[in-house]
Amino acid sequence: MTIASAASKVILFGEHAVVYGRPAVAVPVSEVRAWAEVTTVLSDRGILIHAEDLGRSFRLDDPPDETILPLQEAVRNTVRTLHFPVEALSLEVRLRSRVPMARGMGSGASVATALVRAVGKHLCHDMDPAQASALVFQVERILHGTPSGIDNTVIAYEKPLWYRQGEVIFLRLGEPLHLVIGDSGTPSRTRDTVAHVRTQYQADPATVEAIFDAIARCVEAGREALEQGNPITLGGLLSENHALLQRLGVSSEKLDTLVMAARRAGALGAKLTGGGGGGCMLALAFEEDVPAISEALKAAGAQNVYYTMVM
């Protein structure tokens, strides 16, 4: 048996604006992961995949649907990249994940990264981050249509990064980040929120461009605060970025409630993370304030609360 895992992620700054050429900053969430197990099966020919979180078992050559196609393609592309004949393999794959689906934490990219790593390793090839990221980006295109490339990159490398149109700069943090993540319990439909912003942009490009420019300034100032280890400044910038996302119309009443609850409980700053419309928010905290903020988010209706320290 071969086992591999992958982290999830949150975007600190730059959602939506990144699609229009502005930068973004994202960090891995190492404590919330997906796993893949691959076993050689001697009694059967073909590749059988068990996706526990989907409640589905299917074969690689089964007729695809929108749920299983990304996983089928992840396996198929990995095997082809390593120059193995797909039809000659007899494998059983099991997938499980703690990453909530459709919440802006990169669940699809996380599962796909664990999957390509496990398949590659089982076929005697340790997948380097660049290879894994490239393979998972193909999966992201199936999942999201026009992905930014952030999810597959930050998850494959499991490092904080600055990103713009394929350009990546890995960040060295001045001090660890303590992040509390609250799940609103409502799915975030990235395609829908991206389409909403596109409609706004087409209707009033000057106003939306100005918002994107303001978000870009948050990104660059946030990057500087991260590298200098300045959590007070960083927290203020997170809250500013949230206000700009509200102006784009991609927040929700539930997300705003959680953001305010975190701030009242002592968070240095808080914002939605990911596509918005649902999904998750994050709060920056001093370590000693993490328990109080976590409890405040639960009391405000968060479905789940996660804590991660980013170094």
Question: Which stretches of residues belong to each language-model region?
Answer:
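C-terminal nucleotide
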Residues: M1-F13, A17-V19, A26, W35-H83, ...
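DPxDG-like acidic metal-binding loop motif
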Residues: R103-D128
